[in-house]
C-alpha cells in the first residue's frame, strides 16, 4: 500500500499554493502530517519543486521528484509510484490531493478498506450535502447506483432538481493494474468537457466505487479558500483541537 500526494509548485489561481502558510505551517506540510497519521509505511510527496521537497524532508517525510510537465495529479502519482523502491510488492495506491490541509486520516483508511473488500478498479470518498453546500463551481457532485457505484461526476449539480447531493472528495484509491490502465488511456470527451479526469475511467468501462465519509474537507484553490482555511485553523486552535 502506498499513499502519494502530488504537489506541483506552479498554480494558476493561487501563486505557489503548496507553500502558502496556514498558521506557521505550509499547506503541503499540513496535508502531509494529516496523511501521515494514517500510519502507512509508504507515504510520499510527489513534486517538481526543491522548495516543497525541503519542507517535507525537514519534517521527516519522503519525496519523489517528478517532471513539472506531467499533466494531471494521477499521472504524477503513477510516475512517482514507478520510482518507489520494491514497488512490485505494492498492490494499492491512494492519490491524495495536496490542497486539503485538514483531510481526515480515517477517510484514507476507509478507501483502503473498500478497495480490499471489493472488486472496484478505483474507490473514492463522497459526502452527503444539501444544496447550499455545493453552490461553488469548484465543487463536484456524483450520482451512484444502489450499490454505490459511480455513474457520473459533474461540476453541475446532479441529479437535477434534487435537494440533497453527493459531494465528491478528491482522493482516489487505485488497484495497481487500474492505475497502470488509467494513465495509458487518452483524455476523453467528457473528461475534457467537465475538466474531471475520473470521467476518463468511466468512459473506458472502469469501475469506480464510492465510500461515504462524514465531512467535506477544506480544499485550497484560491485566495478566498486560503482565508477560509486560515480562519478554520484559528478556530480549532482556540478550542485546543
Curated annotation (Swiss-Prot):
The keyword Transferase applies. GO terms for biological process: CMP-keto-3-deoxy-D-manno-octulosonic acid biosynthetic process; lipopolysaccharide biosynthetic process. GO terms for molecular function: 3-deoxy-manno-octulosonate cytidylyltransferase activity. It is found in: Cytoplasm. Pathway: Nucleotide-sugar biosynthesis; CMP-3-deoxy-D-manno-octulosonate biosynthesis; CMP-3-deoxy-D-manno-octulosonate from 3-deoxy-D-manno-octulosonate and CTP: step 1/1; Bacterial outer membrane biogenesis; lipopolysaccharide biosynthesis. Pfam families: CTP_transf_3. InterPro entries: Cytidylyl_trans, KdsB, Nucleotide-diphossugar_trans. This is 3-deoxy-manno-octulosonate cytidylyltransferase. It comes from Rickettsia rickettsii (strain Sheila Smith).
Amino acid at each position: 500500500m502506498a499513499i502519494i500526494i502530488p504537489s506541483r509548485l506552479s498554480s494558476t489561481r493561487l501563486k505557489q499554493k503548496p507553500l502558502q502558510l496556514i498558521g506557521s505551517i505550509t499547506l503541503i506540510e499540513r496535508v502531509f502530517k494529516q496523511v501521515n497519521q494514517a500510519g502507512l509505511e509508504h507515504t510520499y510527496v510527489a513534486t517538481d519543486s526543491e522548495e516543497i521537497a525541503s519542507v517535507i524532508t525537514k519534517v521527516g517525510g519522503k519525496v519523489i521528484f517528478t517532471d513539472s510537465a506531467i499533466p494531471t495529479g494521477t499521472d504524477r502519482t503513477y510516475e512517482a509510484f514507478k520510482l518507489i523502491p520494491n514497488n512490485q510488492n505494492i498492490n494499492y495506491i491512494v492519490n491524495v490531493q495536496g490542497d486539503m490541509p485538514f483531510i481526515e486520516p480515517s477517510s484514507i483508511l476507509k478507501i483502503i478498506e473498500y478497495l480490499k473488500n471489493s472488486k472496484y478498479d478505483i474507490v473514492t470518498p463522497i459526502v452527503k450535502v444539501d444544496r447550499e453546500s455545493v453552490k461553488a463551481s469548484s465543487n463536484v457532485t456524483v450520482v451512484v447506483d444502489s450499490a454505490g457505484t459511480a455513474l457520473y461526476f459533474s461540476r453541475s449539480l446532479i441529479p437535477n432538481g434534487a435537494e440533497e447531493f453527493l459531494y465528491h472528495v478528491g482522493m482516489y484509491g487505485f488497484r495497481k493494474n487500474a492505475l497502470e490502465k488509467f494513465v495509458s488511456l487518452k483524455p476523453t470527451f467528457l473528461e475534457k468537457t467537465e475538466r474531471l479526469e475520473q470521467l476518463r475511467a468511466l468512459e473506458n468501462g472502469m469501475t469506480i466505487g464510492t465510500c461515504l465519509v462524514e465531512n467535506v474537507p477544506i480544499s485550497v484553490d484560491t485566495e478566498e479558500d486560503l482565508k477560509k482555511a486560515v480562519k478554520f485553523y484559528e478556530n480549532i486552535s482556540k478550542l485546543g483541537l
